[in-house]
Amino acid sequence: MEKSSIYGLTWTKLTEWLEAHGQKKFRATQVWDWLYRKRVKTFEEMSNVPKETIELLTANFVMNTLEEQVVQESTDGTTKYLFKLSDGNLIETVMMKQEYGLSVCVTTQVGCNIGCTFCASGLLKKSRDLTAGEIVEQIMNVQHYLDGRNLEERVSHVVVMGIGEPFDNYDNVMDFLRVINHDKGLAIGARHITVSTSGLAPRIIDFANEDFQVNLAISLHAPNNELRTSIMRINKTYSIEKLMEAIHYYVNKTNRRITFEYIMLKGVNDHKKEALELAALLGEHRHLAYVNLIPYNPVDEHIDYERSTKEDVLAFYDTLKKNGINCVIRREHGTDIDAACGQLRSKQIKRVGVRERMKQKQAAAEE
């Protein structure tokens, strides 16, 4: 049987597992400290943990199921990682240098089934969910990279906005959040973590009822059903009306701000008409609504879309501001590398596919 990642256990689950296997409760504190504070890479390095416990952990868990395949570094300090999972699938993770610290964007699924027509992530359909351990390991691999530079840098912020729909992998994502937020471990503050959803309305309600204050972002991208359905297939299942009902519940339950992500597509959703519709849609919650206008990263496979002009983006921004909506134009990261989410993975899979076809042709020619 394949061993699971030790990083998939929350503090509570690790404690319960050790106690169920005859270990004293305080062993969880020791193991947790070695994992997240001292950040060792093998169980054998846990020097104050008894040999019996080390053998128990080694027999049941592994500490790294990700294998680094490609690392791309941008001139602006953005670093993009391509990891291979134990089953051979590929995922992406991105570290971004911000004015407020180091932010990491994690992937939650292998591929994506949401079907946004402008997105590189959806080019490859979802094959499975990531485990909580595989999501945590993305953070740990980046932190180990930082530790190796001896600059005392740490991951301070996390955005769950990589490949996949986080709320379609809800339980594993919640365990991931509890691991990285735990005050005896990485201790990444809940308000420094943002989870983005394309609009799974029932899960937004579930998220409102959780016991932590992690930020929520909504990938909206259009202010009306006709337009949103044309670029986001999920709108057929959860219309803007259903989405706004869930958002209304979330706001009333948490009194927390929501970020609305809006990708700027030339001639599609960037007119004054859409800006006015968006302002009206968010008007009821304008005191807690924050719109993030995102310049589009062109993708080779999506030739129908272009980036909105700077003038149109600024005009859209001005219209929102004049109508009382807080908004910002997102700063771009990694423009000199494969910046679009899913782009690096897609290119790597294509390269592997080409190599395999060449090998097959060569083998056939030799027969």
From Swiss-Prot:
Primary location recorded for the protein, binned into one broad class: cytoplasm
List of residues binding [4Fe-4S] cluster: 112, 116, 119
Any further remark recorded for this protein: Reaction proceeds by a ping-pong mechanism involving intermediate methylation of a conserved cysteine residue.
Cofactor: record remark: Binds 1 [4Fe-4S] cluster. The cluster is coordinated with 3 cysteines and an exchangeable S-adenosyl-L-methionine.
Top EC group: transferase
Positions of the catalytic residues: 92, 341
A biological process term (GO) from this entry: tRNA methylation
Name of the protein: Probable dual-specificity RNA methyltransferase RlmN
Catalytic activity: adenosine(2503) in 23S rRNA + 2 reduced [2Fe-2S]-[ferredoxin] + 2 S-adenosyl-L-methionine = 2-methyladenosine(2503) in 23S rRNA + 5'-deoxyadenosine + L-methionine + 2 oxidized [2Fe-2S]-[ferredoxin] + S-adenosyl-L-homocysteine; adenosine(37) in tRNA + 2 reduced [2Fe-2S]-[ferredoxin] + 2 S-adenosyl-L-methionine = 2-methyladenosine(37) in tRNA + 5'-deoxyadenosine + L-methionine + 2 oxidized [2Fe-2S]-[ferredoxin] + S-adenosyl-L-homocysteine
Binding of S-adenosyl-L-methionine, residues: 164-165, 196, 219-221, 297
EC number: 2.1.1.192
Similarity comment text for this entry: Belongs to the radical SAM superfamily. RlmN family.
Residue ranges occupied by any Radical SAM core domain in the UniProt entry: 98-326
Protein's gene: rlmN
